[in-house]
Amino acid sequence: MPRSQKNDNFIDKTFTIVADILLRIIPTTQREKEAFTYYRDGMSAQSEGEYAEALQNYYEAMRLEIDPYDRSYILYNIGLIHTSNGEHAKALEYYFQALERNPSLPQAFNNMAVICHYRGEQAIQQGDPEASETWFDQAAEYWKQAILLAPSNYIEAHNWLKMTGRF
């Protein structure tokens, strides 16, 4: 039984019903429908912390999905899982791939900035101020991109940029 048919959460059930209706009425190919089903199941598994299952669904969705915009969100979600697992280098790769297909994803820029900022903090703890400045500068560049795309979001990042003289 597909994951989408065994959701217990009301919001998930509602989303699934609406998505199923849309898939029936909007003219799409069978391949697009399958890709969306895997994507939806991946989101459901991800929201429940079932990251291995989510990744399997996302990889299957990537195999089927041909639209670059839709692929960008699949790649972004794969990046989120790697971020959650502490696999920052992999996460950055997936965020980059998502942005190659859709440069208007402020959340990808934000997450890349957060990873770079974290690495800057780690460099400070390891006594490497040069590396920390490099990481912080990179974080600043990503946050500037995120803020450019979504000016009313990322207030804390905006404040950090001002406080550190990077804005």
Curated annotation (Swiss-Prot):
InterPro entries in the record: PSI_Ycf3_assembly (IPR022818), TPR-like_helical_dom_sf (IPR011990), TPR_rpt (IPR019734), Ycf3/AcsC/BcsC/TPR_MFPF (IPR051685)
Annotated compartments: Plastid, Chloroplast thylakoid membrane
Keyword Nucleotidyltransferase part of the UniProt annotation: no
GO BP term, pick one: photosynthesis
SMART domains linked: TPR
Main location: plastid
TPR repeats, residue ranges: 35-68, 72-105, 120-153
GO cellular component: chloroplast thylakoid membrane
Gene3D superfamilies: Tetratricopeptide repeat domain
Repeat listed as a keyword: yes
Keywords annotated in UniProt: Chloroplast, Membrane, Photosynthesis, Plastid, Repeat, Thylakoid, TPR repeat
Function, in words: Essential for the assembly of the photosystem I (PSI) complex. May act as a chaperone-like factor to guide the assembly of the PSI subunits.
Name of this protein: Photosystem I assembly protein Ycf3
Organism field: Marchantia polymorpha
Name of the gene encoding the protein in the UniProt record: ycf3
